[in-house]
Amino acid sequence: MIPEFLVVSCTLAALCHSVPLSLQTEQQKVLVVSFDGFRWDYLYKVPTPHFHYVMKNGVHVKQVTNVFITKTYPNHYTLVTGLFAENHGIVANDMFDPVLNKSFSLEHMNIYDSKFWEEATPLWITNQRAGHASGAAMWPGTDVKIHESYPTHYLPYNESVSFEDRVAKIIEWFTAKDPINLGFLYWEEPDDTGHDVGPDSPLMGPVISDIDHKLGYLIKMLKKAKLWNNINLIVTSDHGMTQCSKERVIELDQYLDKEHYTLIDHSPVAAILPKEGKFNEVYDALANAHPNLTVYKKEEIPERWHYKHSDRVQPIVAVADEGWYILQNKSDEFLLGNHGYDNALAEMHPIFLAHGPAFRKNFTKEAMNSTDLYSLVCHLLNVTALPHNGSFRNVQDLLSSAAPKAIPYTQSTTLPLGSAKPGEYEQEESYPYYIGISLGSLIAIVFFVVLIKHLIRSQMHTLQYMQVEVAQPLLQA
């Protein structure tokens, strides 16, 4: 007969081994949603019950400092790389690369040249290299072949595709036979309307309400698909918006001869490429031209913007004060709402909310950086982050789990010469790993207590038997 204590020992030992292992390998799901141009305080302009539902049952960060320039493509690429614009290479919506001798323009949609994107590696590729699957519904850059890869599933950009259809695809990919563990969902509003009418217009109210309804629809569909309680949903944006006025316009033609330069990017950060031999003339003419315009030589751009160490940043950069608009001449398009200004300005800051099994409940944090999102998502997915400019330590208090240990990274980087180095790389174990370790340790303690009690009882039983034997009289011969 197998001794009882041996059966108990083997059973408990198996449990100790299997429980943490199964928890450690549990695959987390992450869905990142971006509502383009959703300023941090839009949450309070009109009733937004679905946003507040997420806040009450999840986490909310009051102020998110994004990257300069505060435009769509630079900031969406920062969210998925953790890098400043000078490091990931997408420095504006409109760029010229003198090395490639090529232009990149969101306006003309010539954005599909892989070389513009390959100074960094976005999250979906890192996730797929780790053996997982990713899906993207219109997220900027996901329909570009980067490092010979696309997301596992993606929708080519088409603004006419409804939000509901985008959600349907995301749900389909998360519930497929071979499901994704990482999804990206993008919606163009409230940016489009914010440009047309300005963020201070009463016409923004219905747009914000509609986005709240769209978030409610997403939550409803996640619940219907039984994903709501086991998916980590992150709702964020790329930038805010500020109100402009035709009374606050800086017209470059008043100060510069248009034959002496090429205007690569426009308002509110004018990227100026002087014609050969005309640098000093252009700079001198513009340097003190307007009290609401600050003009920098490339090498004099403030370090805090992390913007000057890229070939795609032009020799002269002119930055308008908040609310001021740069036009080459009065015939150029003027927008009542704009962004791209100094990333220290609160009106440029986006939202950040999150809900899911990894996040705390009803928790509000004062501030974070958009570069921090990358390491947070890598942590949730338990994939190794590449060198980045963010900090997991800066956002780990959003999580309900124990904070992971950190070690310095050892990978080399391909950052431009003179660029700021990425912050300390943090090795992030997934939070189920720590739950598993805790439960495993608890079971091990219980096992040893049971084993010791069993051994004590066995010894006591043997001792009692011996005492009874001694008490019996010897047989008479």
UniProtKB/Swiss-Prot annotation:
The chain crosses the membrane at residues 432-452. Keywords: Glycoprotein, Hydrolase, Membrane, Metal-binding, Signal, Transmembrane, Transmembrane helix, Zinc. It is a single-pass membrane protein. It is found in: Membrane. N-glycosylated. InterPro entries: Alkaline_phosphatase_core_sf, Phosphodiest/P_Trfase. Zn(2+) 1 binds at residues 36, 72, 238-239. GO terms for molecular function: NAD+ diphosphatase activity; zinc ion binding. Residues 1-24 form the signal peptide. This is Ectonucleotide pyrophosphatase/phosphodiesterase family member 5.
